[in-house]
């Protein structure tokens, strides 16, 4: 059973944003809100983290002061190539491996069969493995409520198995393979156990890119 979702809830666990003080903070007025039409109520808040052994990462959050609309993204400020990062979570300390996920990043939780893909409502975040599991858990709980209303007992049973597996991963009792892939190089896993490699052109083509558009050199119209 594969669950695909754009997850917008809080990250849960211990976030990198809570561990590291931002080096720079900037607030920009953007004008009117596209959701509620509030005049001059939309603003962007930007701050920069310097993550050890990785570099500078900017978190940008757009907020409406009137209706509460909120959307976030993460941008790595140093030029990076399209990459795949992978780590095997085997013990509790692995839960603190850092996760930088931009709107263009795809996260796979292999043993759970869960894929978090980019989409119109996707948000970027800086967190850790535990935070990603909490996000997945929240989506599964929402799906469980929906399936209960439909009286789909088999789906509820399968979701309960996934929720149990997540708790066992957090307790260090079950393994979990975590991958993050980003065609723009704006996402990463950061830790000693993490393995990474450059994405192939075929892998890049297959990835969902959300609100972003990629133009291949051979697709540019001739003048």
UniProtKB/Swiss-Prot annotation:
Pfam families from the UniProt entry: jr-ZPR1, Zn_ribbon_ZPR1
GO molecular function: zinc ion binding
Zinc finger (C4-type): 33-67
Annotated InterPro entries: Znf_ZPR1 (IPR004457), ZPR1 (IPR040141), ZPR1-like_arc (IPR004470), ZPR1_A/B_dom (IPR042451), ZPR1_jr_dom (IPR056180), ZPR1_Znf1/2 (IPR042452)
Domain of life: Archaea
Keyword NAD: no
Coiled coil (UniProt feature): none
Keyword Nucleotidyltransferase: no
Record keywords: Metal-binding, Zinc, Zinc-finger
Family listed: Belongs to the ZPR1 family.
Cited PANTHER family: ZINC FINGER PROTEIN ZPR1
Descriptive protein name: Uncharacterized ZPR1-like protein PH1223
Source organism: Pyrococcus horikoshii (strain ATCC 700860 / DSM 12428 / JCM 9974 / NBRC 100139 / OT-3)
